[in-house]
Amino acid sequence: MPRLVTLLLSLVGLVSCGHPTPEIRSLDPAHPPERLSDWGIAFVAGGELRVHAQALVYDLNTPLFSDYAAKQRAVWIPDGLQARVLADGRLEFPVGTVISKTFYYPLALDEQGTGRIRVARSTGGGTAAGIDLDSHLPVETRLLVRSEDGWHALGYTWDLARGEAFLSPAGAMIPLELAGPDGGQAFTYVVPDANQCSGCHRPEHGGELQPLGPRDWQLSDWSAWQARGFLDPTAHLSRTPVRWDDAATFPLEQRARAYLDANCAHCHNPSGPADTSGLHLGLDQPLDRHTGLCKPPVAVGRGSGNRPYDITPGRPAESIMVYRMRHNDPAIAMPELGRSVVHEEGSALVESWIASLPGNC
């Protein structure tokens, strides 16, 4: 067993004794505590990273890809308050709401001796309230906190030697190795800094920072939110949910469009940070030039790969979209933030969809 992993697991033993269960507190996000546990929503106890029982652990139907990390998502809304479902499916949360998302990996405990912590690919998050620290590595926990003046984004990086995650406004770089059938892939997991958090969570120029994932059709268990009292029990979904990886239930085009909406549309929309590209990838955008169909590139430099169109119907290998999804060069790769490795399954989905499109440019 590599020394780094041995050390990691020995450190887990230091934090497995547990602490009294804290209370969830909605603190002033303008002056956040250094320790994640001070918020009370996520903490280490009994050898697990746990979510407070007053919070709701939830999952998304089509989540954002983040270097094959699993994500433990949780939301807490103060007693007596509810989120309101807007006409477009976004949720309007009350003041005091705390949303947490912990990024973690299953540990791959095979002998490699690379000096990096070796982790396994995860296919999702799920709704388990506890993460076993004997077999998993938490990397970071991100908080979104709703105050009177809007949302605040806070990042905490995990230090298992102290059984705690600490505020990291400058971000962090964590060397890891991703195990696979053909060996390991070394990569650097990037914990975003405060500016990067704000950049992605402002889907409109000059707009307010806001949550991206929890829209009504994205919630994998809508009824659980209603049963907990976090949503009006009479509220209805604004659109049919789609799971990007469920080929048995959902058509190829629906799955590909849902994937692009979740992974790209917060920037690629008419008012977003990537509006100058003219590429709009939200679910409400019809399949036309704005979605990339036979659309020439705009100021992408090497990002075009000498390909003429974002999407060339029937020809994924000739499509800029696939070229950029399949690339890791920072000057070429898309999305440009949030990933250091290629999402093989997501890229394959978009390739299959483009291959199925009829017509010519």
Q: What are the language-model segments listed below?
A:
Residues 1-4:
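Positively charged n-region of N-terminal signal peptides that target proteins for export
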Residues 6-16:
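Bacterial N-terminal signal peptides
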Residues 17-27, 115-361:
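Sequence context surrounding c-type heme c attachment/ligation sites in exported
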Residues 20-87, 93-95, 100-107, 122-126, ...:
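Conserved small-residue
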Residues 86-88, 112-113:
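Short, glycine/acidic-enriched capping/hinge loops at junctions between secondary-structure elements
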Residues 106-118:
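Internal, charge-rich low-complexity segments
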